[in-house]
Amino acid sequence: SRGLGDVYKRQQIDCFRACGLQLAQNTMAAKFSNTRQVIRRTLHDNAELRDNQEIQKVLGILHDGIENVYRAETIEEVMGIEGYCAQNYFSIFNRLITNTKVPFSFEFRTKRPPLDPVNAILSFVYTLATNEFAAALETVGLDSYIGYCHALRSGRVSLACDMVEEIRCLSLIHI
């Protein structure tokens, strides 16, 4: 019934108010850890990249990001750290694209609309993952539009966006 749905929605909102910062910190720490793992796997598989100073610098930034999110006092601070780490990750992303039959070139992240084939693939994969998460969240009774990291915005499944953060880099491994 609608009344029960409203109760669940209220519980979700109350939970995110009470522990949203901790959820954001844990989500972003996991995102940075997973991103570091993807980079290390790429380095393991591509010996010629292991001594690349820019890649090593980004690994350090992501490591520091894990520590820094737990020092953050607001979700906005956490998201600022996430933005800084993402910007640095995407600064080396082109070097991480290996073993392709078709030459891909990536300079920087663009969205709405993506301006090159790599950005189009990123946006497509992220959209698929976000839609899958939104469906799963709705199935278990959560409101996918009410998240803890991403601000509420008309039409955005903020909770699904929050959940996808942790696995974004993993969703690209086999593409």
Locations of the language-model features?
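Active-site helix-to-loop segments that bind/position phosphate- or nucleotide-bearing substrates
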Residues: 10-172
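Short, small-residue-biased leader/transition segments that mark boundaries at the very start
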Residues: 2-8, 175
